[in-house]
């Protein structure tokens, strides 16, 4: 846990420093005003043009691009801004719950790390899980957002949301088409290159915008970095408790009991039980990203990277994000102890991702 905390300290200090430059220069406010027509439908309790809109957008964009190191600090910045609007400081608000479920559903465009692991394990086509994973994580996100919208009585059938869904669908279609036109080696190189270029561009753009607005960029960065240090210290107790809980769960044998129980029940119905071998990865991903990666690699070692179980474990790993880790860190950063229905909605997204991973894997690989 000390390694995780020390790693988070540097990352949070860097990115909250960059975000403070954007805040002081007015860039976040400008981004918030631009996003208001869409985000005010999903987050109706956030005032139009509030800085939280910009931070939420930056976080979700970083998540979709697989820029985890940038996404978490931006998400914690958004949580701090949402907490400023919170009349009950120990209770999660509706916008917080919607934001966290959008994070836990783990929508990502290109699962670069999963494809890298498949390549290392000797898969003939490491990228063959791309389209199934993209479909699965999209389903998880849609179900999660829908669950929160039903709980909060948000109407999703309005023009801005439908236009956004249409644009995302077109983008996904274009991405899938481009994906089919390049080799797996080129895809890995291009994905990493694009991610690094975007990361560098974001940092450079914030600094240049601050210089253009004639603010003291250095002082703004230092101020934000100090906030990052304070935030990292604040989340340590929550993070340690969470990591201890995961260790107990993994070593107690509870995972084996759950997986074997599911396999037994499915077997009684006469249905195919081959998917059960990938369930440890699917269940662990809600708790720990590194734990899920380890189980995914173990599954590929045991069954083979190109086996049905090996491929499904990869699809399941990319279906959603580490729900309990995200809830612990994000809520812990602002002192939220009453999470309301955040865990329930997050687990609904997780469960839908697991079901989708099973069905889609059977369609593509069985």
Name each model feature, range by range:
Residues 4-6:
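Short, small-residue-biased leader/transition segments that mark boundaries at the very start
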Residues 27-31, 142-151, 200-221:
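Juxtamembrane interface elements at the cytosolic ends of transmembrane helices
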Residues 1, 119-123, 180-190, 219-220, ...:
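Membrane-interface helix termini and inter-helical loops of multi-pass transporters
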Residues 35-75, 240-258, 263-299:
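Hydrophobic alpha-helical transmembrane segments of multi-pass integral membrane proteins
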Residues 13-37, 245:
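Juxtamembrane transmembrane-helix boundary signature
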Residues 213-232, 339-340:
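Hydrophobic, small-residue-rich membrane helices and short re-entrant helix-turn-helix hairpins
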Residues 8-15, 163-171, 193-209, 236-244:
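Hydrophobic mid-bilayer segments of alpha-helices in multi-pass membrane transport proteins
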Residues 71, 78-118, 123-153, 279-366:
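C-terminal transmembrane helix pair
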């Amino acid at each position: 846990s000390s390694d995780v905390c020390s790693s988070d300290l540097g990352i949070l200090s860097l990115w909250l420093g960059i975000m403070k430059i954007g805040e002081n220069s007015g860039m976040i406010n400008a981004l918030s005003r631009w996003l208001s027509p869409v985000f005010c439908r999903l987050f109706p309790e956030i005032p139009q043009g509030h800085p939280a809109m910009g931070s939420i957008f930056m976080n979700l964009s970083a998540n979709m691009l697989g820029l985890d190191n940038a996404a978490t600090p931006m998400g914690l910045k958004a949580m701090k801004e949402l907490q400023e609007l919170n009349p009950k400081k120990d209770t999660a608000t509706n916008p917080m719950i919607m934001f966290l479920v959008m994070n836990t559903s783990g929508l990502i465009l290109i699962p670069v790390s999963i494809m890298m692991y498949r390549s290392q394990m000797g898969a003939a086509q490491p990228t063959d899980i791309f389209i199934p994973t993209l479909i699965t994580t999209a389903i998880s996100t849609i179900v999660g957002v829908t669950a929160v919208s039903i709980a909060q009585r948000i109407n999703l059938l309005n023009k801005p949301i439908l236009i956004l869904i249409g644009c995302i669908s077109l983008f996904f279609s274009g991405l899938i088409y481009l994906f089919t036109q390049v080799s797996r080696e080129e895809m890995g190189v291009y994905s990493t290159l694009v991610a690094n270029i975007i990361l560098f561009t974001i940092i450079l753009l914030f600094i240049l915008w601050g210089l253009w607005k004639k603010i003291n960029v250095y002082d703004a960065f230092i101020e934000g970095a100090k906030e990052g240090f304070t935030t990292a210290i604040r989340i340590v107790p929550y993070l340690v408790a969470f990591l201890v809980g995961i260790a107990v769960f993994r070593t107690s044998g509870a995972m084996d009991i759950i997986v074997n129980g599911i396999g037994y029940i499915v077997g009684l119905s006469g249905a195919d039980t081959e998917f059960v071998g990938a369930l440890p990865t699917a269940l662990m991903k809600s708790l720990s990203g590194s734990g899920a990666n380890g189980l995914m690699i173990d599954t590929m070692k045991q069954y083979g990277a190109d086996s049905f179980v090996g491929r499904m474990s990869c699809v399941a790993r990319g279906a959603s994000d580490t729900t309990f880790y995200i809830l612990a860190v994000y809520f812990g950063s602002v002192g939220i102890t009453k999470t309301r229905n955040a865990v329930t909605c997050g687990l609904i997204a997780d469960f839908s991702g697991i079901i989708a991973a099973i069905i889609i894997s059977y369609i593509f690989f069985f």
